[in-house]
Every structure is written in structure tokens, then in C-alpha cells.
Amino acid sequence: MKCVCPLRVNTFFMKTDLQLKSRYDGLPLSALVVEPDGRTPEAVLQIAHGLCGCKERYMPFMEYMAGHGVACVACDHRGHGRSLRKSGDLGYMEGGYSALVEDMKQLTDWSVSHFHNIPIVLLGHSMGSLAARIYLKKYDWELSGLILSGSPGNNNMAQAAILLTGFLCLFNEGRSKQPRLQEYISSRFNKKFSSEGPLAWVCSDPAVRNEMMTDPLTNFTLTANMMHNLLSMMVRTYSKQGWAVLNPELPVAFLSGEDDAVMGGEKKLHDAAKMMAGLGYNNVTAAIFSDMRHEILNETDKEIVWNDILDFISKIPSK
């Protein structure tokens, strides 16, 4: 097998809005494709964003990747961005996380049919990193690489918290907003940075935090249903059951910021990497970036991370 050539720089790219209908339940899915203009991409990077995220927040990163020969596809998760049945569904995950994972598989299938026979790398950030590992349990053979950014550390309290959110979901189909619970979780992450504002734990760049605060697609209140699915995803991700490991040589990279409160400490990151290695994945690495917080793709020194991702992709064998 030959390896993908060193990625070439090209400042021209094409951006395409993509509308899909979920095969799972017909939910409208809003996606975005950013690809090199005038040449065939050397890889496809599929992005699974985090909680309260949306695909547009990754545009600078996707443009950079496309400029270096990597096509990017990203889809708003159900209950996020514009992947909604109605406007009031923002913060509500209709169909649950199983539907979300099948939506991700649908985007992979679209990428395979559109780009033809080039490596597909999945990048999951935060909640997206949980979804990516649940995806991996079923579909690891579809991927040529996996990148897990801002992975939440395993939390032994998740199982107990599921009982609370499960109870809340008994009422109004789990659509009740949970501002106090959401604020409590965020404040715990923000303890170290409280003097800088309520979202300082997310990123050290005030401009990034201001964008999140002022954008209605990223500043919204979660429902009991969304929190229940998030916790359920954590439990499912860190369960050693259900892993087929059909692609044991798959390159897997954990990438986190040194000051990422969601990580729960460097030991938990390395424990997550060791777990995957123990399951039978033979090419698992973990890297921690100094002076960076949760959103390493948006930090002030983000191009360090972007270039490491390009390097990771450039070493993936071509098909």
C-alpha cells in the first residue's frame, strides 16, 4: 500500500449546502461540504460536532483543510443547528443518540458515493467524540482514521445521573428545558476560569466565546431528553460491550487541551486511549496541547492542532 502524498496547499475551495432526509425517521438534516476546487481531494474528513455546536463553527477549520487537499463534510446533529423538524426542537434530540449515529453513517455513505474510493476520516469533538466511538462499534470498517477531540473523561456518576434525567423524561416527552442543570454542569467546568466569564472553560479566545454567547444556534437551553441522551452516550461509549473491532489497524488519535476541564484530567484521557488499545485497536495515540482548553480547534494557537491533524491524515494509507 502506498501512502497519501504530502498534502498540497491550494487556497481555492468550494462550499456546498447539503440537505438530507434521515433514513432513520425522515428528520431533515442540514449538512455542509467544503472541498478543494479544481482537483480531487486526497481524503475526506467527516466532522461530528459537540453539544450546543453547529457545523458553521467549523468553517475556518474546514476551509483550511480544503486548502490542503482534504474535503470536509459536517452535519448538524439532530436537535442542533438546522437539523430540526420544527424551530422549537432546538435542544431536543428526537429519536435519541441511536438515530444520531445512524445519521452519521448516512453522511459517510453520501461521502463514499460522492467522492469515490478515497480515505474517510471521522473527527468527533466532545459529545461528537462519544457519538464517534458508538459509531465505531458498528461501522469501524468504513473508516481510514478516527480523531477524538475534547473527549469527555469517563464519569462514574453518569449512570446515577441517568436515573434523574430518565425521570425528567417521563414528563412532556423529555421536552422540558433544564436551565439549572445546564448551568450547574457548565459552572463546574468553569471553576478554574470563573473570573473570565461563564464560557471561559470552552476556549481562551474571548472572541470565540462572544460568538457562542450571541449566536442562537449555540446559546440555547437543553431539554431533559438531550441531557439524558448525552449521559447515555457516555455510558455506552465507555462500556466494553458491543465492540466488534473489525478494523484493528485503524489509526485513532485522542487530542485534548491541557486545561480542558471536560477531559477530567490527563489520566482519564490516557485511560480512554488504553481502553481502546485493550479492545484490540493497535494504533491508538493520545496528545495533549499545552495552554489550550476544551475547543482546541478554536484556540488562539489552533493552527498547531490543525497541522497535526493534517499530518495524521497524510500518513493514512490510500485506498
Regions picked out by a protein language model, each given a short descriptive name:
Residues M93-V112:
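Alpha/beta-hydrolase active-site loop
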Residues H49-G53, E258-D259:
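Active-site glycine-rich loops that stabilize anionic/oxyanionic intermediates
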Residues F13-P36:
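N-terminal cap/lid segment of alpha/beta-hydrolase-fold proteins
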Residues L279, N283-K319:
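Catalytic active-site module of serine/aspartate enzymes centered on a nucleophile-bearing elbow/loop
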Residues A132-L217:
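Alpha/beta-hydrolase-fold enzymes
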Residues M62-S87:
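Conserved alpha/beta-hydrolase
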Residues F115-S126:
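Alpha/beta-hydrolase fold nucleophile elbow
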Residues F254-S256:
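Short beta-strand/loop motif that positions the catalytic acidic residue
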